[in-house]
């Protein structure tokens, strides 16, 4: 029965050594006495120990709280001091001039960073005073990392400050030079700006571009100092490419600027020279003023010279850029245009010659037809106009002849510049013109013949009942001519032929029915007379057969 009690006793007493004799009894008695003592005094001992432990730690807690409070106050003081010091430098106003104030300025951000670093130091002291090393160790590691990064940050800050100073100086120089070197007059002369406000805006824009470009040049050094290799490496490569490309870009821009100035100068010289020698009078004599409404021939020639100069200039600038993806297709296209320029010039000369020849043909054809009395043809066709027309018939024919001549020259010009699709269209139109002319001739002849037949029938046929025969004959001839003209034009030949046959058959049927129904009495009398004549002829023949003549 003592075995379970003995095991508990051994565990609770830490297996204290007991003499072998009477071991079981001694162990049991000692365990019982110890057990009864703990039950009575344990609570009092625990309360006293806890209270004394708290009392021993209370000074550390008070000191830690004082350190936390004082450290927080010092951190706030440092934050305000840093903010005021940075505000006096006006960094944001210099870096972001002309922009709306941001919600978080650089002064506020930097002062907050300093404030939180000071708070980290205060928390480290607070937790160390309380002997909470486990809680303080992350803050210590964080502060150690910040302290280790301070040299890099200072180095990056110095590089950024140097870059900002260099950018500010260069931007200031650009602005001053732009305002003092009579740039405004040159920009107005080149028609790049119109007002003084635009000039100031252009100069300010140029100075800001210089400012940010210089900052970008210093930015890879800042990133390298901060050891941000994930960003600094690609950004450094990009900046190296940009810096290597800038001389090419500057050279290309310089080439374009010089070429543009030369092209403008040549254009103005050619335009003024051609205007002084009377090119506009020549254009008016050639009839080109109609096509040059808002400009002049000298201005057009000057613009052509301007374009011819700018094309090789642009080719040279693109070659200088050495950007294969852009320069090669563009250079190839411009070279193709340059190779086509002789053909284009010949084509332009042909078109101008066609316009001049068309004008000459128009005047000649109109004059010949007018002297031949062609303007009275419409009157002979019965198509007199109630009010006099702006253009006479001879002028209309002359204009058609002019269009045909211009079209012929234009087709040849398109053939020279190898615009085959347009050549096919122009050739098709020219090939179709004879059909149109023949159709117009047939229709005009039909109108003339119809009017002539109407007049002849009206003069020959008297009587009210035959009054409608003359118009019917006229419009029958006109309809016949109209169908012949459509057939000549090839407009739905099957339908036109079928319609003509149907109309002609209708006329024949109508004539037959009208003759059969309206001329029934006349036909019966005519047939009776014809029958009597036949009978009389037979009787005379029989008499001759019965009384033959006597032969001698």
Swiss-Prot record:
The record, for Pfam families, names: MS_channel_1st_1
* Gene3D superfamilies reported for this sequence: 1.10.287.1260
| Disulfide partners | none
Matching NCBIfam families: msc (NF033912)
Domain of life of the organism encoding this protein: Bacteria
Q: Which UniProt keywords apply?
A: Sporulation
Name of the protein in question: Uncharacterized protein YgxB
